[in-house]
């Protein structure tokens, strides 16, 4: 991967890099700015109004030192000469009015920016979540769930901090700096130029801080993502962790990642610890120098005491915003690194895109055809060298073969989780790439060996593919797969909560609920990918009758290492190395001397010692 070929850095390719080529860093920052501008665009009018509000707020703030100058120079002398406090009272009232305007406009500004910031975060979360769901399995195969969680939590939180307080501080600081500089020169050019003399050094110091913090906060976002990734994966696989006594090793890994995250934050804190006191030091030295120089000018009669007092107040206002800017850099660099990652995710495109003009499939029949299909995964190794296959509508086909033979890949192509590298996969004569997502997911349903259940009731999980299904339809589907008895025996029946990942149910019960879910969806093509692998032999036999009901009048692809499941199929395809080496009805293949016959004999030998289970 070369640093100058920017095509290699699209999407999430730069996520794990601490330091990037300057050209790539520029492109990532530009991509992040485009995302931020896109999020801010709907609020253009509100932002313009808020800029006007903050201008008024800063004008009121800047007016107070000038009013102090007027009070000292024009309000106090008349009182000492016996003319009364009229001028001073007027100035005091003006100061109070300016303070009231400052408070009111500040309240409006903070209230509106808080609401706009939350609306933007709402849209960003929605957009990122929706995009993650649209991305193809090929992306999720290499992008861990921990990284997904990190994008939607810590990265969003970093952007939230910038929107809620960062922009407020930046806008206020910039307006204060510009306004103060103008007023310093207006009050006295000599003192003004002297006060602004350290500004070039301050800008150089700030530029150095920006460059260093950019690297540091990118590293911070990467390390916190790794901490979240390890935590999520460890908790998701907690049963395996405890079963293999991996707790000490996992703790060691987590401690190392956690230490890396701490070190990255410490480096950021060191930068802030250097920059913020440095700005204060420059500001205080400038105040001392102006006090000395201004006092000398005042003795010479070139400036009044009021002007000198206003100068000192303005200088405090002038250098305080530099500290605000330093804090904004802290927030912005963290948010900028988060924006880089989120914009990278949003730049990813599904490997299985939606067609521009989808072909409607009103009543799918389930005829599947592979025409010269070739397929390989990301490493380029052919999984299906060439596949020509026709499956008539309503036929159940069992795919048999050793691990890595290509069975699951073939099924995933039918479900269009992937697109072939060459050739076409057709459903009822229509290329799957021309079908809309809704039509395809209605026509083809996959039941996997993971039998994933979502938190909720059994009825909710059965309705997953058809949320509008009635209770009667849910019960009918559960009866069809032979699960009604066990569901009814549960304390809360169909309203029983399955727990996280269905953990309150046994593996066999989870599989039966997954079968019921598929049956209720009523697809034209049903794919069972190792769908009975979680059942023991007696349980598997009990489900055979229900399986025949499920497969009736629909096309089915059955992938199983257990050949008892294959016996209910109309046709068997034996695969090896991505090719079909045997094809025929199961009875005929069993009687032959091929691979399927050998597998069948081995299966009979493996269950010869098991007790009989009544049909």
PLM ranges: what are they?
Residues 21-29, 52-53, 60-73, 98-145, ...:
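Juxtamembrane helix-loop junctions of ABC transporter transmembrane domains
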Residues 44-45, 137-138, 154-163, 167, ...:
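An intracellular "coupling" helix at the cytosolic face of ABC transporter transmembrane type-1 domains
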Residues 46-56, 165-219, 290-303, 320:
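Transmembrane helices of ABC transporter permease
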Residues 47-105, 185-190, 288, 301-305:
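Transmembrane helix-loop-helix hairpins at lipid-water interfaces of multipass membrane proteins
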Residues 78-79, 183-197, 267, 271-340, ...:
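Helix-loop-helix
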Residues 354-355, 361-615:
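ABC-type nucleotide-binding domain
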């Amino acid at each position: 991967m070369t640093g100058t070929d920017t095509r290699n850095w699209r999407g999430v390719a730069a996520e794990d890099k601490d330091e990037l080529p300057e050209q790539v860093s520029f492109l990532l920052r530009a991509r992040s700015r485009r995302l931020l501008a896109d999020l801010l665009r709907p609020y253009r009018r509100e932002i313009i109004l808020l800029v006007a509000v903050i201008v008024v707020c800063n004008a009121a703030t800047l007016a107070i030192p000038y009013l102090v100058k007027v009070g000292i120079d024009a309000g106090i002398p008349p009182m000492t000469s016996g003319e009364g406090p009229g001028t001073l009272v007027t100035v005091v009232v003006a100061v109070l009015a300016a303070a009231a305007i400052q408070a009111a406009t500040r309240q409006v500004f903070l209230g509106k920016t808080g609401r706009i910031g939350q609306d933007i975060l709402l849209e960003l979360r929605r957009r990122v979540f929706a995009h993650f769901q649209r991305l193809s399995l090929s992306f999720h195969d290499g992008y861990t769930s921990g990284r997904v969680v990190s994008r939607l939590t810590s990265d969003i939180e970093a952007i939230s901090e910038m929107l809620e307080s960062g922009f407020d501080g930046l806008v206020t600081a910039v307006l204060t700096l510009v306004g103060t500089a103008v007023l310093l020169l207006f009050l006295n050019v000599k003192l003004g130029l002297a006060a602004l003399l350290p500004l070039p050094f301050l800008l150089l110091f700030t530029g150095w801080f920006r460059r260093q913090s950019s690297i540091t906060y990118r590293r911070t976002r990467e390390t916190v993502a790794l901490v979240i990734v390890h935590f999520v994966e460890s908790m998701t696989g907690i049963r395996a962790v405890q079963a293999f006594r991996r707790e000490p090793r996992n703790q060691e890994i987590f401690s190392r990642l956690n230490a890396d995250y701490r070190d990255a934050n410490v480096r950021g804190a060191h930068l802030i610890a250097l920059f913020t006191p440095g700005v204060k030091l420059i500001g205080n030295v400038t105040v001392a120098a102006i006090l000395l120089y201004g006092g000398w000018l005042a003795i010479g009669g070139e400036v009044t005491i009021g002007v000198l007092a206003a100068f000192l107040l303005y200088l405090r206002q002038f250098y305080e915003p530099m500290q605000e800017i330093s804090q904004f850099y802290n927030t912005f660099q963290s948010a900028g690194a988060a924006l880089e990652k989120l914009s990278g995710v949003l730049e990813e495109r599904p490997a299985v895109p939606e067609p521009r003009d989808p072909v409607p499939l009103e009543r799918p029949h389930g005829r599947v055809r592979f025409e010269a299909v070739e397929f390989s995964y990301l490493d380029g190794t052919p999984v299906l060298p060439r596949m020509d296959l026709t499956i008539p509508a309503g036929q159940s086909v069992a795919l048999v073969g050793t691990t890595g033979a290509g069975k699951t890949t073939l099924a995933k192509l039918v479900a269009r989780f992937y697109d072939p590298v060459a050739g076409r996969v057709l459903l009822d004569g229509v290329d799957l790439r021309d079908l809309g997502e809704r039509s395809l997911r209605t026509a083809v349903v996959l039941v996997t060996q993971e039998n994933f259940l979502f938190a909720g009731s059994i009825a909710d999980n059965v309705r997953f593919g058809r949320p509008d299904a009635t209770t009667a339809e849910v019960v009918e589907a559960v009866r069809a797969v032979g699960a009604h008895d066990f569901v009814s025996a549960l304390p809360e029946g169909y309203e029983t909560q399955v727990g996280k990942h269905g953990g309150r149910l046994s593996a066999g019960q989870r599989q039966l609920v997954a079968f019921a879910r598929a049956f209720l969806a009523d697809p034209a093509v049903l794919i069972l990918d190792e769908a009975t692998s979680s059942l023991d032999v007696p349980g598997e036999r009990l489900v055979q009758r229900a399986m025949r009901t499920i497969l009736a009048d629909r096309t089915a692809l059955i992938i199983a290492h257990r050949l008892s499941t294959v016996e209910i199929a109309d046709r068997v395809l034996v695969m090896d190395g991505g090719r079909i080496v045997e094809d025929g009805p199961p009875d005929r293949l069993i009687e032959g001397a091929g691979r399927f016959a050998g597998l069948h004999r081995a299966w009979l030998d493996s269950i010869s010692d098991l007790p009989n289970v009544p049909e």
